[in-house]
């Protein structure tokens, strides 16, 4: 199997330069949503347990002076994702990255021209058209900003961009047989979003291992973006009474900016 190159929120300059080589590496982009440096043990947060990231960091180059540019609206992850995919600065994006015009070439498009198969699973908080330009395959895709991690409405990749399908749902069968239609082709109720996207990524890698074509795999997690919810096995790793809170922590935001009841960060 071709050598895998894992990239986490870094510049693609080294990737593009490597395409001239005879043997093109497979590329895996793993993107965590709204994850801060303070959430990683190897960056000095000793009370946080991140053994896998610590091991990866020990074998990698870590860009400790790289910072996100933020956003000009309430969203930070959406423009950050668009900047990463296009190489554009914040103020050169269109609509904060909610749409990515044809003139903004994405990394997936560049890799396709170099002979790569491109696959995405996970969050894509941008347009359908941009997704289909950047990738030619995909499964378990979430179009949106935030959602219940245990009940994620998902779509598989559609070359014709037919992402308008809705799921029939009866919310209260005891009181009514009324059918409502909600976003998403399907849903794995009770399965955490991290497990869903990881499964699809592993399945894709297994399918590609005997193929000669190099691949670009994008795995975009919805976590740790709020709402804060995680499997109990990870909650049990910590004694909540011993967690040290930062000096600027507040139980509740002092004023309502219009999102007080839907955000927990």
How does the language model describe each region?
Residues 15-17:
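N-terminal signal peptide c-region/cleavage motif recognized by signal peptidases
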Residues 2-4, 9, 19-265:
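Formylglycine-dependent sulfatase
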């Amino acid at each position: 199997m071709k050598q895998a190159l894992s990239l986490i929120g870094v510049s693609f300059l080294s990737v593009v330069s490597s395409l001239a080589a005879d043997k093109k590496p497979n590329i895996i982009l793993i993107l965590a949503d709204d994850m801060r440096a303070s959430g990683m043990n190897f960056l000095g947060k000793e009370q946080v347990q991140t053994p896998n990231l610590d091991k990866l960091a020990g074998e990698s180059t870590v860009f400790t002076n790289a910072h996100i540019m933020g956003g000009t609206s309430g969203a930070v992850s959406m423009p950050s994702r668009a900047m990463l995919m296009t190489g554009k600065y914040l103020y050169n994006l269109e609509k904060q990255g909610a749409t990515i015009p044809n003139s903004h070439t994405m990394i997936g498009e560049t890799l396709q021209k170099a002979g790569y198969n491109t696959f995405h699973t996970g969050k894509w908080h941008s347009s359908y058209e941009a997704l289909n330009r950047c990738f030619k395959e995909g499964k378990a895709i979430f179009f949106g900003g935030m959602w219940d991690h245990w009940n994620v409405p998902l779509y598989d990749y559609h070359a014709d961009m037919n992402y308008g399908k809705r799921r029939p749902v009866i919310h209260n069968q005891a009181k009514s047989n009324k059918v409502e239609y909600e976003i998403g082709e399907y849903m794995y109720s009770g399965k955490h979003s991290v497990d869903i996207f990881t499964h699809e990524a592993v399945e894709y890698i297994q399918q590609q291992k005997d193929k000669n074509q190099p691949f670009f795999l994008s795995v975009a997690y919805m976590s740790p973006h709020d709402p804060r919810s995680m499997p109990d096995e990870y909650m049990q790793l910590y004694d909540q009474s011993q967690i040290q809170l930062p000096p600027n922590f507040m139980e509740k935001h002092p004023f309502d900016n219009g999102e007080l009841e839907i955000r927990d960060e």
